[in-house]
Amino acid sequence: MSRIKGCITIGILIISWCLMFWITGSRTPWQTFSSSDRGDEVSVFLGDIPSENYDRMGFTKGLIEYIDNENAWLVGTDRGELFLFDNDGKQIWKRSLGIGKLVSMCVSHDEKIAFIGEQSPSGNLYAIDIAGGDILWKFAAANVVGAEPAKRSYPSIVHICIDQNDNVYANAYRFVTAKDGSRGYNGKAVAFNKNGDQLWQFPQNENIDSWINWCDVNDNNGKVVLSTSAYEIRPDMKYRDTMYLINKETGQLINSVDVLPVAPFENTVMRGSPNFSANGEFLAASCSDGRGLLFDGSGKVLWQRELSKPTQIDDAWINASGRDGFAVDAGVPFTTINTFNRENWQLPTPVEHPSNNSMFVFNYDGTFKYKYKALGTMEQIDFSGNIAACAVGRNVRTHNYAAHGAVVIDLNDGAELNFFHTDGPLQAVAISTNGRNVAGIEAPAVTPDGKIIGAYKLHIWHR
């Protein structure tokens, strides 16, 4: 009899696991709804995802925004799921948006609508009701940049920004790799009002034959700026310039800016910038070649600074790529990421570049204020007044796992106010409006010795 009872118990457990796996898609479904509270920190498991190689170029992502009206955190995942969590880590609602990865997010000024971009066979842009998670409207990037699933060429809404009227400006993009290793690029900037009515697209009758990763908009100067970031410039490419300034009302090109490259690079690449100052008078950008630039609102260079000079050591060109550029009240911050070998990022480098994984802050007249150096890549930065919260992720050269976590910096002088460690690399960060709470998304990783560190988690820290 006891053997029969044991078999029944095991059978019930197996059926329960199968049911929970069907509902959650997680091999450890009991963790999907779990959270832990460690004093001033709350962590929530976001579900199973593949643990990626620590040293690979592309890596697990996550999206997070603070919703002041709800005192809550809007979280998007690589599993295609969108959550709203309160400040104690309690799930308010969850929405599964599709089969793709969520890759971009922006929230309306009244905090009623979230605009979410995904990478998938459709590449949808979603408008989501923040109160309940309902889909208000959607637009498929595949309609403007196409899709080639057989070649694993999927469209994405790679970046989103909004103006003061909550008009939405989105970069739709996909690339395809040919048999000879060359890349084909398809990009389009698309504008909508908050109800989903399309206002314009740029270019009107063709695609941008370059990688477009970033855009920003400003109401005071009436412009949208796009930056390009193609790996190489081919003779037959039409959209070869670095930045394109567009009339935000009509979608017509105002002017374009070609930022000349520095040796040994053949073109200038901007991936996490440029961004306008609030008054629209300035535009800050960081380049992959290691330069930080400040432009005026028309795209004229006011000054440039060498953050990370490409250096040749033992026949290898190494540099610390620049990525982010901002124009905020406290100054003009730029960031650099890991040290890379110019010939091939997968190749080792003789040394770390001394300017890697750093934030450089300048005054608007170009004078240097300070440098803050992290021990890993600053994956994302969010601001609350003159405080910056930074997600510190991987260092693919030193494998210093103690570097992972969220750091809070005083932008006035670069003082480190807080550091919250995570086991795995922190890939996204946000800070509350009052600066008292910080949240981040940790990702798992497989180390070179085969060990899995970290997990796909939301962390909420109370400062």
Provide a role label for each language-model segment.
Residues R3-K5, W17, M57:
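Generic N-terminal amphipathic/basic segments
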Residues M1-L13:
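N-terminal Sec-pathway targeting helices
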Residues I12-M20:
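Sec-dependent N-terminal signal peptides of Gram-positive bacterial secreted proteins and lipoproteins
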Residues W22-R463:
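Secretory-pathway ectodomains
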